[in-house]
A protein has these predicted regions:
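A short N-terminal interaction module
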Residues: 74-108, 112-117, 121-130
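Class I S-adenosyl-L-methionine-dependent methyltransferase catalytic core
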Residues: 1-53, 61, 65, 69, ...
Length: 317
C-alpha cells in the first residue's frame, strides 16, 4: 500500500531513515515522504512521524492543481469527513488555508463534519509539491512521554529519550520476534523501546549497578554483566545491535583507552551480528575510521542535543 507520511521536524534525516522499517521510500520532501508499505499496521512502531495517510495523489501547490486532482479522484464517502491543509515550513499555496479546506469539502461527495469527522482528507504542502491523502493513523506520543526516564523505577542521568531510542531501533530494521542486543545497555532505555514493539531483547553492561537498574526497569528481560569486547554470545546469533557507546568521566569503562574499547566492542559486534544485518551505534565524537575497520558505513547522522553534546549516529552493515 502506498502511504504518505507527515514527518516530525526533530531532525532533517532521521524521520525518513526510520521509515525503512515499514517500507520503501519512493519520494521525499521537507517533513514529507511517500513509501510503499506491505503492512500498513506496522506504522504504529514509528517514533518520528506525526500523521500517516493513504496516498491518493499529488499536484502542484495551487488551487487549480488541487481542484484537478480532486476531480480526477472523484472521492465518494458515506462517513462524515473533514478536509485539512498542512503547510510545511514556509510552503504556500495561491489561496488561503481555509479556502483550500472548503474546496476539499466541496469536491468530495459525502457529509462534511468539521467538529466530529470519522475520516480526514489532508493536503500537505511541502517545498514545491502538494500531496493528498486520507488519514489512517496518528502516532501516539503519549506512550513515549509515559516512558520518560524520570518515571522509571531506576533513573540515571544522561540517558537517551524514548523517541530517539525507538527511532534507532527502527533504523536497525529489527522485526518483532527477532533478537536485539545492547552491549552498553545501562538502565535499558533502548531495549525498553524495542520490547514495546515485540522484539526480544538482550542487554549487557560492565557496571553491576547499571545491570541492577536495568532489571528494575525491564523485569523479566535477559541481561548480563559482561565486557563489551568479550561478550559470551555465539557468532552470528543476533538480528540487530543498537547501542550508545560510553563517553566522559561519568561512566565506568573497562579497557586501556576509549579508542581501544570502541575498536574491541565494534569487532565483537561484528562477530555476533548475523551477516547482512545492521548495527546502529551512537557516539559523541567521530569514530568512522574505527567503525570502517569492521563494517560498511551505510548512513551517518548528527543530532545536536545541547551546546556541549552532539550525537553521531552510525548505521553499520
Amino acid at each position: 500500500m502506498k502511504l504518505l507520511f507527515e514527518l516530525s521536524g526533530e531532525h532533517p534525516d532521521l524521520p525518513a531513515a526510520e521509515l525503512e522499517c515499514v517500507g520503501t521510500v519512493l519520494d521525499r520532501r521537507t517533513q514529507v515522504a511517500v513509501a510503499e508499505c506491505p503492512d500498513p499496521e506496522a506504522v504504529g512502531r514509528l517514533a518520528l512521524t506525526h500523521v500517516v495517510m493513504e496516498y491518493l495523489g499529488e499536484c502542484e501547490p495551487s488551487k487549480e492543481g488541487l481542484t484537478g486532482l480532486l476531480r480526477d479522484l472523484a472521492i465518494r464517502t458515506e462517513k462524515p469527513f473533514a478536509g485539512r491543509v498542512k503547510l510545511i515550513q514556509g510552503a504556500h499555496m495561491d489561496a488561503a488555508r481555509l479556502e483550500v479546506e472548503k474546496l476539499i469539502g466541496g469536491l468530495i461527495a459525502g457529509p462534511v463534519s468539521l467538529r466530529d469527522p470519522v475520516e480526514e482528507y489532508r493536503a500537505v504542502v511541502s517545498d514545491d509539491r502538494c500531496y493528498f491523502g486520507r488519514v489512517i493513523a496518528r502516532i501516539d506520543r503519549g506512550g513515549f512521554e509515559f516512558r520518560n526516564p524520570m518515571r522509571r523505577p531506576f533513573f540515571h542521568p544522561g540517558v537517551m529519550m524514548p523517541r530517539m531510542g525507538r527511532a534507532l531501533v527502527n533504523i536497525s530494521l529489527v522485526r518483532p520476534g527477532e533478537l536485539i542486543f545492547d552491549p552498553f545497555c545501562g538502565t535499558g532505555g533502548i531495549l525498553l523501546e524495542a520490547r514495546e514493539i515485540g522484539v526480544r531483547v538482550l542487554g549487557s553492561d560492565f557496571d553491576p549497578v547499571m545491570v541492577a537498574g536495568y532489571r528494575q526497569n525491564l523485569p523479566g528481560s535477559d541481561v548480563m554483566i559482561a565486557d563489551a569486547t568479550a561478550v559470551p554470545v555465539c557468532d552470528g546469533a543476533l538480528d540487530s545491535v543498537v547501542t550508545d557507546l560510553p563517553y566522559g568521566q561519568s561512566v565506568r569503562i573497562h579497557g586501556e583507552s576509549m579508542d581501544r574499547l570502541y575498536d574491541g566492542s565494534l569487532a565483537e559486534i561484528r562477530r555476533i551480528l548475523k551477516p547482512g544485518r545492521r548495527a546502529v551505534v551512537v557516539t559523541h565524537r567521530d569514530i568512522t575510521p574505527i567503525a570502517a575497520r569492521h563494517f560498511t558505513i551505510l548512513q551517518e547522522h548528527e543530532q545536536r542535543v545541547h551546546k556541549s553534546l552532539t550525537r553521531r549516529i552510525l548505521v553499520l552493515g
